UniProtKB/Swiss-Prot annotation:
Keywords: Signal. The lineage of its organism: Bacteria, Bacillati, Bacillota, Bacilli, Bacillales. This is Uncharacterized protein YxeF. The gene is yxeF. SUPFAM superfamilies: Lipocalins (SSF50814). Residues 119-144 are annotated as: Disordered. Residues 127-144 have a biased composition (Basic and acidic residues).
């Protein structure tokens, strides 16, 4: 079978377009910067008995865990959320889901790899907790 020269160039052109289109497709987004476990940097309080507190952000939940005097590690009820906006400065705004959480929070990168969490008029600067293997915690839930 002989293909005319004009058709060969057409086929080559289509192949080139397909390669360019497939190469320009958006790559899968990397894990958001705020996923993982963060130390709230909370100083032990004289009355509440909380020694330390951590926050874990996953794909759709915020889980706070406190280490309390005499009780050990206590996980507070998780809060489901959704991302509602992202600013040009890289900060994101999340809204909590559920009847008791009509509130919003802002998460943004701080200096030296910290996370700034603004919620209920409070501003917390948190540092990432590294796992025992020395790697950053990436507690993203896997989808089933």
């Amino acid at each position: 079978m002989v293909i005319p020269l004009r058709n060969k160039y057409g086929i080559l052109f289509l192949i080139a377009v397909c390669i360019m289109v497939s190469g320009c497709q958006q790559q899968k987004e990397e894990t958001p910067f705020y996923y993982g476990t963060w130390d709230e940097g909370r100083a032990p309080g004289p009355t509440d008995g909380v020694k330390s507190a951590t926050v874990t952000f996953t794909e759709d939940e915020v889980v706070e865990t406190e280490v309390m005097e005499g009780r050990g590690e206590v996980q507070l009820p998780f809060m489901a959320y959704k991302v509602i906006s992202q600013s040009t400065d890289g900060s994101i705004e999340i809204q909590y889901l559920g009847p008791y959480y009509p509130l919003k929070s802002t998460l943004k990168r701080g200096e030296n790899g910290t996370l700034i969490w603004e919620q209920n008029g409070q501003r917390k600067t948190m540092t990432r907790i590294e796992s025992k293997t020395g790697r950053e915690e990436k507690d993203e839930k896997s989808k089933s």
